[in-house]
Amino acid sequence: MRLIVMGQQAFGKSALEAILEKGEDEVVAVYCAPDKEGKPVDPIKTFAEEKGLPVYQPDNFKDAEYLDAMRALNADLCVMAYVIIFVPEEARDIPTHGSICFHPSILPKHRGPSSINWPIIGGATKSGLTFFWPDDGLDEGEILLQKHIDITPDDTLGTVYFEKIFPLGIEATLEAIALVKAGNPPRIVQDSSLATYESWCRKADAEIDWFKSSADVYNLIRGTNPQPGSWTTHDGNELKVFDCAKVEASGKPGEVVAVSDEGITVATKDGGILVKRVKPHDGKKITSADYISKVSLTAGVVFG
C-alpha cells in the first residue's frame, strides 16, 4: 500500500523506521508538526529527510493547498503515529482506506492527551494501547486493534511508556497496517458508557498532598516520573520528587521524620514515603543523600 505516515517525536520516528525496514509498503509522504523557533527539529522530520521522503508540516489541515497536496499523493492509508493535533474528516478520508490512529490506552478508558500518566496515578494495574479509526470526537472512533500491558507496583511513567507501550506500539503499528491491507479490518464501536476522559497532566496536578495516603502519594510520584514531575516545597522553594518507596512512618503529614543515606522519609496520612531522588529548584536531579548534605536537612522539617 501507499502510506502517509503522520507523527512526531521518538514514537513517530520509530514507527516510520519500522515500516521502512519491513519494506512491504511505500511511504509516499511524512507529515509532522511545524518547526518551532528555538526547539530541536523533530526526529521524524530528520529521519524522513535522511531517507529522501517528502515532508509536509501544515499548521492546519483546512487550507485547500494542503488538502490538494494530500490528494495528489494517491495514498491508500494514513497512519497516525502519535498525533496530538486535530485532523479534520476532509483530510482523514483522503486516503482510499482512510486513517488509523495510535492511542496509548485501552479505549474507551483514558481518552485524552495524558493517557499514560493517569492510570498510574489512579493505581491501575493494567493499561495498554489502541489503534482506532479517528472521527471528529476526541479518541472516540471505532477500534481496529488493542494490546494490553501490566503496570507493576514499581512502574513509573517512564518505564510504562519506554519499556512497554512504546515497543508494543511499534509492533502494533505494523499489525494494524497488515489488518487494513488484508481487507475487512475490524471496526468495533466504543462503548461510550465505559468512557473516561482526562486532560493534560500538568504541574498543578503533580503537587504532592502529604495529607493523602502513602499509596496515593506513591502513585502520584511514579505516575509523573519523569514528566511533569511531582513536587513539594521546602523553605518556600519548589522541590521535585522522583524515585521513592512506601515505608512505615509516623508523624504529621509532610514532616521529615528521618534522613539517611537511603533518602528522606516524609510522613503521610497513614505512613511514609522514602524519597530517594529529588531536583532542587536551582539544580539538576540528585540523590536525596546529596540533597540532605547540600541543605543540611534534618528531621522535623516540614515539606509542603
Feature roles, as predicted:
Residues M1-P226, A258-S260, G271-L274, P280, ...:
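One-carbon transfer enzymes
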Residues W210, H234-G251:
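Short, solvent-exposed recognition patches
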Residues T125, E163, T232, K240-D243, ...:
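Short, intrinsically disordered/low-complexity patches at protein termini
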Residues K279-G283, L297-T298:
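A short, acidic, flexible beta-alpha connecting loop/helix-capping segment that sits on the rim
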Residues A245-I273, D282:
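Low-complexity, glycine/alanine/valine/leucine- and proline-rich hydrophobic stretches
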Residues K240, L274-V275:
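A sequence-level detector of short linear motifs
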Residues I208, S230-H234, I264-T268:
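Short acidic-hydrophobic surface loop/beta-edge motif
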